Amino acid sequence: MVQRLTYRRRHSYATKSNQHRVVKTPGGKLVYQTTKKRASGPKCPVTGKRIQGIPHLRPTEYKRSRLSRNRRTVNRAYGGVLSGGAVRERIIRAFLVEEQKIVKKVLKIQKTKEKQAAKN
């Protein structure tokens, strides 16, 4: 006859957060073993892609004691938060904005010089 199994925790519904597997103990008994949810890993908030170089863990396992800093991040600006493509885009955009400011400034100076020349 098949051995009946009962959950070992109070949560009694077969939901995604209460997944179990049947394991045979050395004593020959069948028991439920709670399985952990599969981790999807960190995503870039801009592109939505997975951030490469960071292990896929559950959110609590990224804490200081469980994972060292060099495993939690990537060695660049916004490392471990934004993907490489998003960082590259931000750098280029910032550079172009600064260039535009300089161009505006130069045009303004040229205009004032032309006005001065027209007056004289």
UniProtKB/Swiss-Prot annotation:
GO terms for cellular component: ribonucleoprotein complex; ribosome. It comes from the Eukaryota. Keywords: Ribonucleoprotein, Ribosomal protein. One of its GO terms (molecular function) is structural constituent of ribosome. Pfam families: Ribosomal_L34e. GO terms for biological process: translation. Belongs to the eukaryotic ribosomal protein eL34 family. This is Large ribosomal subunit protein eL34. The gene is RPL34.
